Amino acid sequence: MKPAYPPLLLQMSPAYTPRPLKNLFTANQCWAHLLEEGGLRDIEVETVTKMLACGTSILGVKHYTCGNHSCPHVKYLCNTCHCRACPSCGKKATDQWITVQNNRLPDCPWQHLVFTLPDTLWPLFFYNRWLLDALFRLAADNLIYAAKRRGLRVGIFGALHTYGRRLNWHPHVHLSVTAGGLDEQGVWKNLSFHKEALRRRWMWLVRDYLLGQPLSQLTMPPPLAHILCESDWRRLILAAGGQHWHIHLSKKTKNGRKTVNYLGRYLKKPPISGSRLAHYTNGATLRFTYLDHRTQAYQQETLSQADMLFRVVQHIPEKHFRMIRYFGFLANRVCGQYLPKVYEALKMATPGPTPKLYFAPMAKAFLNVDPFRCVLCGARMVYTAAISGLTVQGLNLNAQAIAQMRYVKP
């Protein structure tokens, strides 16, 4: 079936070089071959197809004409995909999230924590991704419980990461918590956490949660294929990890900006940056460098192009899964009630609304060129029409054709 492209046809130009991540997928038609083989999740196909079509007329086009009626200049701007796996769209989403958080977070000491799982349980969460949803709640409950015992309400925001530095499957939870909280009288009091107590309770909470899941509802990964009955399941969970349930507590910081900037770099973008793929020359294999946290030395790993693609797409979250969540007085349900009290207790001015980021100011700041200024006469470009692009259903139907377009230029 021929792809049903929008009215504005694509111009194919061998002089155009796609971004490194797009090039990784389209070189040697590797992604197209993987689509033919099948076995990919629906969300992986949908997200990658959106990313490959981003910035082309496939997603639709906005038509601008010069405000000076005697000027013939016309400009077309192609729509973007707004998906998390896109390195282009991730920049705006990242900056917007960081701006919002830095504006509203209380100006007080914060502490960053990382909750990890034993590697024997990693495959279980890979084959049963719905289990990931509870990790947020279990990790946050650990901190809320410790604060509640002291009569305090803390603020927490967190993110789920599913990848390690080698892009392998390694689910873990990042949480940032205020190093203090509100008591019942609305007074702010400092708070510290005991690492070993947190570790033991984290281990108990995860084990208790997993033991509560019916074995019939779980998909057992190949390494755990021998688990056939409830007693085997219970034995596995109670023995998993031994003492290798780790929690990392960073040093307290004077505010939450450092953590916000750190998490923002990873949450709205692909798991690997384009700069780490810039050296890729369309070969059958590629080599990438990563920092080994055990040896604190840089290591190199060589992978086939297909293996690298599998490592990237496995970290695409399921549809509607929220990778960032808020708890305590930052929870969406109660933040309107408690944040004003927190600002008052910390003697902070109530922050105003966060300015929204738009394409034109960002482009002007980066390129030093106003995208809506006519290049011929200097007048303002005026929006006049739009050409609709493919819907999500249309993108999925044309995924194979889009994957085969190596060089795409609108």
UniProtKB/Swiss-Prot annotation:
Function: Involved in the transposition of the insertion sequence.
Annotated keywords: DNA recombination, DNA-binding, Transposable element, Transposition
Molecular function terms, GO-annotated: DNA binding; transposase activity
Domain of life: Bacteria
Claim: Isomerase is one of the keywords in the record: no
Name of one Pfam family that matches: Y2_Tnp
InterPro entries per UniProt: transpos_IS91, Transposase_32, Zn_Tnp
Protein name, as recorded: Transposase for insertion sequence element IS801
A Gene Ontology BP annotation from the UniProt entry: DNA transposition
Assigned protein family: Belongs to the transposase 32 family.
PANTHER family the record matches: ISSOD25 TRANSPOSASE TNPA_ISSOD25, TRANSPOSASE
